[in-house]
């Protein structure tokens, strides 16, 4: 279920800052037509930190409604207060989602034991599979492989999204967590190499604007056709890099607007629109990738 090219989906807003649910439906249809293997709703790329609880739950529910069982829907439920993640998990238990993705608590820098207890508390109240999410570049805390292994022993913790970019961890996690534990890359630039080393796929930002290419690349990779996959990867590499020229999702939201995938590139403060000096850089990356 959790493999291939999974999109960390944008949350489209209208010019007045309200969520654009018609735009959300359009994005869902774009991804299904392109062969995307799954959707993460309201993760980091979906601007989870600036949505209200009510908006968060509604975006997830609407995504489930629009997808209508055609591909898996994963709900972002991360927070830096355990009770908040627990609340999201309870609210979404009957939503029809296929899994939850929960980022490590950010800013307050818990210990490894704190991280273990945080995820254990979430797992105990959720009735869907849980995906751990480690992105120390954003959270200032690193979920160490030994802690991942402890968590993998819990019944409904089934996967890890690893956005460290450290490819050595693929083999370490596989050895510690076993063959059945799902390993997903959270780093587009190293995602293909991650799968070459034994991962099952990627949760991707690039997928937002190059969905078919990403789906094709990871289909080829999972079939063991790495040379063909690498041709696509090299063409997309300018996107993998330049979609992070400013904090994500700023560049990818601008790019999606240029491609007509969303009508408005509005972001909620403290995120602001892509700096004008970066426009030609991202535009050139899209041109080099063959999507613009």
Swiss-Prot record:
Pyruvate binds at residues 45, 203. One of its GO terms (molecular function) is 4-hydroxy-tetrahydrodipicolinate synthase activity. It catalyses: L-aspartate 4-semialdehyde + pyruvate = (2S,4S)-4-hydroxy-2,3,4,5-tetrahydrodipicolinate + H2O + H(+). GO terms for biological process: diaminopimelate biosynthetic process; lysine biosynthetic process via diaminopimelate. Pathway: Amino-acid biosynthesis; L-lysine biosynthesis via DAP pathway; (S)-tetrahydrodipicolinate from L-aspartate: step 3/4. The record marks 44, 107 as: Part of a proton relay during catalysis. Homotetramer; dimer of dimers. This is 4-hydroxy-tetrahydrodipicolinate synthase. It comes from Vibrio vulnificus (strain YJ016). The gene is dapA.
